[in-house]
Amino acid sequence: MNISNKIGIYPGTFDPITFGHLDIIKRACKLVDKLIIGVAENVNKHTNFDIRLRTSMAKNEVKGAGIDADIISFNGLLVKFAKEQNASVIIRGLRAVSDFDYEFQMSWVNYKLFPEIETIFLPASEDTQFISSSFVKEIARLGGDVSNFVSKSVQSELINLNRVENGE
């Protein structure tokens, strides 16, 4: 299925980007002619990595996976960013029913703000459905192995983050 001549936005904080995000990105690319990964600077959400590093990690991971997508950081309303990018589709990944409740509400609000922009929900693949950036950061913080969830370069950034947080 290809939504002809469509630009899609896959937004997130990507703090950090995980294999779950990459799974959605790969699948989203099949649905639109152009995919923009919007790295959000959300003032209401604490992030461990700054916007430049999150954007850089996303660019490296997407390029390393051989995915053709643009990575752009943004702040403010998602639908405003989508409109600025001439996107007509917002793509959101869903891991669990709890994600759906929140995402469904957000899609309704976005529709009310800009009805010309649709939201598409992609369920996480079976092997990525329980990966979250929060879980990955917690596992790394506690010294666990996160190699099943993120790339080696992201693992290195998590190690650096933990060193900084521990005053090393």
Curated annotation (Swiss-Prot):
Keyword Calcium in record: no
Chain positions recorded as ATP binding sites: 13-14, 21, 93-95, 103, 128-134
HAMAP family: PPAT_bact
Annotated keywords: ATP-binding, Coenzyme A biosynthesis, Cytoplasm, Magnesium, Nucleotide-binding, Nucleotidyltransferase, Transferase
Pfam families the record matches: CTP_transf_like
Protein name: Phosphopantetheine adenylyltransferase
Subunit structure comment from the entry: Homohexamer.
Catalytic activity: (R)-4'-phosphopantetheine + ATP + H(+) = 3'-dephospho-CoA + diphosphate
Leader sequence segment: none
Chain's gene name: coaD
Any single GO BP term: coenzyme A biosynthetic process
Function field: Reversibly transfers an adenylyl group from ATP to 4'-phosphopantetheine, yielding dephospho-CoA (dPCoA) and pyrophosphate.
Enzyme Commission (EC) number: 2.7.7.3
Molecular function GO labels: ATP binding; pantetheine-phosphate adenylyltransferase activity
Subcellular location: Cytoplasm
Major location (coarse): cytoplasm
Site note Transition state stabilizer, residues: 21
Source organism: Wolbachia pipientis subsp. Culex pipiens (strain wPip)
